[in-house]
């Protein structure tokens, strides 16, 4: 229950703060320019042209909250082509259905529960993409600037020499960094590094 609630809270946070998210992503662009393709803002003539016809996503199974990453695409009028995680196809499917029920065009969504070959096709045919996976899955895309790779957790906790003797003050941070979301997120810490006592 706790993990489900936390993941859904992250998606809720992204949706309810979409105006702030879009402001950050667009640097305050008047979003009406997305519809017209051009306009004037801050005394400057602006034009908008998307860098991709669709955003490709190869989603993981470890956390429903990562679906919050593609939500701004819809507001930015960029279709999404999603390969859901094998064990967790439900969150992206439900989000897509909710967007369609709210009036978003069904054509803005592609939902393809497919294998690795299908995932590769999505990543290689969309102009921009995100891929989640282990090193064997993501390594082939590491040098492709059009594909944002989210691989296995390499996050570490570093306790400097100035703080190590007070390590008990940081137990809560260490615990949550390692175990939040059941320790399954790619941002979970996989080690605690203590240089003062390194061999």
Model feature map: region roles:
Residues 1-41:
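N-terminal Rossmann-like NAD(P)+-binding subdomain of aldehyde/semialdehyde dehydrogenases
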Residues 98-103, 126-128, 134-199:
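ALDH superfamily catalytic-core signature
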Residues 11, 35-93:
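Substrate-binding/gating loop at the entrance of the active-site cleft, primarily
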Residues 88, 92-96, 119, 167, ...:
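Amphipathic alpha-helical segments in well-structured domains
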Residues 44-45, 109-128:
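A structured beta-alpha segment of the ubiquitous adenosine-cofactor-binding alpha/beta core
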Residues 58, 76, 81-85, 112-114, ...:
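Generic beta-strand/beta-sheet core signal
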Residues 83, 87, 98-107:
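Catalytic binding pocket for nucleotide-activated donors in carbohydrate/polymer assembly enzymes
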Residues 40-41, 63-66, 113-118, 136:
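Short acidic loop-to-helix transition motifs that present clustered carboxylates
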């Amino acid at each position: 229950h706790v993990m489900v609630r936390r993941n859904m809270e992250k998606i809720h946070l992204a949706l309810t703060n979409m105006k702030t998210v879009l402001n950050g992503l667009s640097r305050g662009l008047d979003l009406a320019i997305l519809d017209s393709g051009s306009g004037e803002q801050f005394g400057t003539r602006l034009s908008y042209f998307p860098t991709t016809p669709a955003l490709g996503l190869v989603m993981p199974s470890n956390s429903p909250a990562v679906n919050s990453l593609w939500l701004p695409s819809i507001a930015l009028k960029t279709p999404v082509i999603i390969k859901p995680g094998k064990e967790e196809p439900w969150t992206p499917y439900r989000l897509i259905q909710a967007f369609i029920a709210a009036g978003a065009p069904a054509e803005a969504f592609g939902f393809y529960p497919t294998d690795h070959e299908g995932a590769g096709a999505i990543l290689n045919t969309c102009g921009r993409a995100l891929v989640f996976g282990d090193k064997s899955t993501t390594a082939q895309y590491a040098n492709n600037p059009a594909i944002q790779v989210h691989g296995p957790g390499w996050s570490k906790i570093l306790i400097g020499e100035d703080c190590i003797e007070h390590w008990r003050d940081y137990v809560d941070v260490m615990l949550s960094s390692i175990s939040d979301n059941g320790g399954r997120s790619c941002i979970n810490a996989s080690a605690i590094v203590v240089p003062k006592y390194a061999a």
